[in-house]
Amino acid sequence: MGRCPAGVVLLTDRRAARGPLVEVVAAAVDGGVRWVVLREKDLPRAERLALAVELRAVLADVGGTLIVAGPDPLDGDAVHLPAAGPYPPPRLGLVGRSCHDAAELARLTTEDYATLSPTFPTRTKPGYGPALGPEGLRELITASPVPVLALGGIETPDQVRACVDAGATGVAVLGAIMRAPDPAATATTLGSAFEEAATPMSRTPHPTAEIPTRGLRPTVPTQGSSLTARSGHGRPQPPTATTEERQ
């Protein structure tokens, strides 16, 4: 696939959702979400596959991506694996891994990205922790060989900004959007906080991650331009001043 999740990444939970799951996800996509992780691992494969087909259709119109939790990609090409395994990871277009400490990060081999959790105390998994906090998150991101999504208890714009400041290339969100009275508005609010914090003036993103533009379809390179050039990586540098210019 050639890119890693960034921005606001939505994790599904049909039991927490305030409406039908596909409708909640569609609203979040309207609010700017472009990455969705399908959980619902308790469903029979046939039902989960049907749900994956529906969610892929929702994401297709905006160039979004569905990632499936677990080793079975459900006829897709992107999975998110638990810390427990399998190892080595399957050969697919995009593979993520849940991590919680430096030892688990050290086990990464060919994964494309990782989540680190819990960043903050979470209502979804009460008592799960202890929470890393922004500083703990920063320390682990520094040691990570791959881009990192912050996960766990992220519900406010300030928390999103703290994660970006710690070096996260995205924030994985469940309850804040699933339980929201207006999932689209919540997704927009959190996405705006991410974009503001992730501007080039405030931080440099991990070189293999993309920062999505909320509400826009993927950009197609035009003549004389490239995605690499527009992202800032590989951009021509200004000429070095001569000795005379420096005097």
Enumerate the language-model features and the residues they cover.
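Conserved N-terminal beta1-alpha1 strand-loop-helix module at the mouth
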Residues: 1-78, 88-89, 95-97, 102-112, ...
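Charged helix-capping and loop-helix junction motifs
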Residues: 49-53, 129-137
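Non-cysteine beta-strand/loop elements that form the S-adenosyl-L-methionine
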Residues: 112-120
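A short acidic, helix-capping loop that chelates divalent metal ions and anchors anionic groups
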Residues: 120-126
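Intrinsically disordered, low-complexity polyampholyte segments enriched for Lys and acidic residues
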Residues: 210, 234, 244-245
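N-terminal amphipathic/hydrophobic targeting modules at extreme N-termini
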Residues: 215-221, 225-239
